[in-house]
């Protein structure tokens, strides 16, 4: 039986899918419990959802001729401690900058007078 992990309501965050899949790998290690292998868990958030909606020939896995958005991780994508290194959408690198990274960069090495009045 194939298992897919996806968004089932608007309040659910898609960024948690790798964590949910990783949890199922951990459950498989509990004696008497069921869970997924690492490969099954990765497929549950990539190729299996594409197959379920009938798009398995176009999306869900990296093969020549298929459309792909790719995320590059600095470790195991199913581990909570792994971080995103790069994102490509339709082959184009995407910026990973966000409000938090811009604030970090702005105040990492503050210069004289660069801090807001409240911080001086």
Regions found by a protein language model. Name each.
Residues 1-73, 93:
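His/Asp/Glu-enriched, well-ordered alpha-helical/loop segment
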Residues 14-15, 85, 113:
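Extracytoplasmic low-complexity/disordered linkers and repeat tracts associated with LysM-containing
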Residues 51, 63-107:
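C-terminal cap of metal-dependent C-N hydrolases
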Residues 109-120:
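Short, solvent-exposed cationic patches
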